[in-house]
Amino acid sequence: MIKIGAHMPISKGFDRVPQDTVNIGGNSFQIFPHNARSWGAKLPSDEVATKFKREMKKNGIDWENAFCHSGYLINLASPKEDIWQKSVELLKKEVEICRKLGIRYLNIHPGSHLGTGEEEGIDRIVRGLNEVLNNTEGVVILLENVSQKGGNIGYKLEQLKKIRDLVDQKDRVAVTYDTCHGFDSGYDITKKEGVEALLNEIETLFGLERLKMIHLNDSKYPLGAAKDRHERIGSGFIGEEGFAVFFSFKEIQEVPWILETPGGNEEHAEDIKKVFEIIEKFGIEVD
């Protein structure tokens, strides 16, 4: 069974997310643990957490298919000490919010070194992750591949491996693969050889069991453009045929697919339908 969903709004409460996910045709989701554009975050109440867990069970959503995404302001690679410290403290709080809700995975962008260089940036990321992981429990941090721009660290999967190799609690660090970011950085998943190379790289660097989520996004710009502009499924440069190639791999089918495409719930429902239309149109076998 394909595990698919979208990044869902929390404006009406955490407890609305499971039902809203089912309403758009999904069985998986990603949420922000708080206002993504704020340094402020607070733990949900016991009542809110209980209601959320009840709705998860009621709507039949597996906890392995539920994810949080860290806030936009966090930058563990920042050379600015105040920003780095605030990032560490907010990430700790996000881990605690995940624990309270019962969510096992927290996705993060590794960060931007802001011109100070990859090595220094990775050192700061590792120090930040160690500070977070050594002072929290349970939740697994997912390192997401990012677009190659603005000093971003993680546009190459080997950069994510460098980070994970240096972290104390490696068992609490896994990965997310974003199709738009990867395409933006030269990973061509529109061809069978490209997907095979990607899977081989993930297996070699991390082990495929460490790939916990796929951010399923088309790209508004061509291969290697380094623009980081998501597009709706089938409407970008990956396109229907490209996604058909990607979807045909069993290793890809085993991982939850989370849409971060333009629009809200209505558009995400349409994109989920589009995914299944592509699967049917190209005769892709699904277990």
Curated annotation (Swiss-Prot):
Alphabetic keyword roster: DNA damage, DNA repair, Endonuclease, Hydrolase, Metal-binding, Nuclease, Zinc
Coiled coil: none
UniProt-listed SUPFAM superfamilies: Xylose isomerase-like
Organism whose genome encodes this protein: Thermotoga sp. (strain RQ2)
Pfam hit, one: AP_endonuc_2
Source species taxonomy: Bacteria, Thermotogati, Thermotogota, Thermotogae, Thermotogales
Signal peptide annotation: none
Enzyme Commission number: 3.1.21.2
List of residues binding Zn(2+) 1: 69, 109, 144
Annotated binding of Zn(2+) 2, by residue: 144, 178, 215, 260
Cofactor: Zn(2+)
Function: Endonuclease IV plays a role in DNA repair. It cleaves phosphodiester bonds at apurinic or apyrimidinic (AP) sites, generating a 3'-hydroxyl group and a 5'-terminal sugar phosphate.
GO molecular function: deoxyribonuclease IV (phage-T4-induced) activity; DNA binding; DNA-(apurinic or apyrimidinic site) endonuclease activity; phosphoric diester hydrolase activity; zinc ion binding
Gene: nfo
GO biological process entries: base-excision repair
Name by which UniProt lists this protein: Probable endonuclease 4
